Amino acid sequence: MPKLGMQSIRRRQLIDATLEAINEVGMHDATIAQIARRAGVSTGIISHYFRDKNGLLEATMRDITSQLRDAVLNRLHALPQGSAEQRLQAIVGGNFDETQVSSAAMKAWLAFWASSMHQPMLYRLQQVSSRRLLSNLVSEFHRELPRQQAQEAGYGLAALIDGLWLRAALSGKPLDKPLAHSLTRHFITQHLPTD
C-alpha cells in the first residue's frame, strides 16, 4: 500500500532530478534511467507518474510555468494601487525571478521551446505561457495608452524580456539582472506618457 503523501514527494523528486539532468547533459541526452537514478527511484516510478520522458518534460515545464506565474502574481499583489510603470516592472521582475533564470531552469526552457514545435501538448503549454505574458503587459500598458499602442508596447516589451532572457541562456552566463532591469525600465518609460 503506498504511503500517504508520497505521490507529491515523488513527483517533486522527479521534477528536480529532471532539471538537474537537463542542466548537466541536456534534454536529448537525459535518459529515464539517469533521471530515476538521480531521484533515487526505479524507472517504473517515472512510467507510473508520467508515462514517458515527454510526460516528465511536460510536468517539469508545468512546474516551471507555475513558478513563473506565482513570481509575477506575488509581485503584482504587492502593488494593488501601483502605477502602470510599477506593475510593468513587477511583471518584468517575475520573469527574471531566480526560479526562471537559474542555469537548470534556462536549459529546461530552451529544451521545452524546441520540443514544443513538435509536440502538441507542449505547444499548447508554451502558447498559454506566451499569451499570459503578453496579456499582462498589454493590460498594464492599456491603463495609460490607447488599445493599439498598448498592444504594440506590450508586444515590444515581451520581445525584449524574451530576447534578454534568451541571450543570457545562450551565453552560458547568468542573466545580468541590473542591465536587464535598466533596459526594460527604459523601454517602459519610453512608451508610457509623461506627466
UniProtKB/Swiss-Prot annotation:
Q: Tell me the GO molecular function terms.
A: DNA-binding transcription factor activity; transcription cis-regulatory region binding
Q: What does this protein do?
A: Repressor involved in the biosynthesis of the osmoprotectant glycine betaine. It represses transcription of the choline transporter BetT and the genes of BetAB involved in the synthesis of glycine betaine.
Among Pfam families, the record links this protein to:
TetR_C_6, TetR_N
PANTHER family reported in the protein's UniProt record: HTH-TYPE TRANSCRIPTIONAL REGULATOR BETI, HTH-TYPE TRANSCRIPTIONAL REGULATOR RUTR
Organism of derivation: Escherichia coli (strain SMS-3-5 / SECEC)
Q: Which GO terms describe its biological process?
A: glycine betaine biosynthetic process from choline; negative regulation of DNA-templated transcription
Reading the lineage from the top rank, the first entry is: Bacteria
Query: Boundaries of each HTH tetR-type domain copy?
Result: 8-68
Its UniProt pathway annotation is: Amine and polyamine biosynthesis; betaine biosynthesis via choline pathway [regulation]
- InterPro entries listed in its UniProt record: BetI_C, DNA-bd_HTH_TetR-type_CS, Homeodomain-like_sf, HTH-type_TetR-like_transc_reg, HTH_TetR, Tet_transcr_reg_TetR-rel_C_sf, Tscrpt_rep_BetI
Transmembrane parts of this sequence: none
UniProt gene name: betI
Q: Which keywords are on file for this protein?
A: DNA-binding, Repressor, Transcription, Transcription regulation
Under what name is this protein listed?
HTH-type transcriptional regulator BetI
Residues in the DNA-binding region are: 31-50
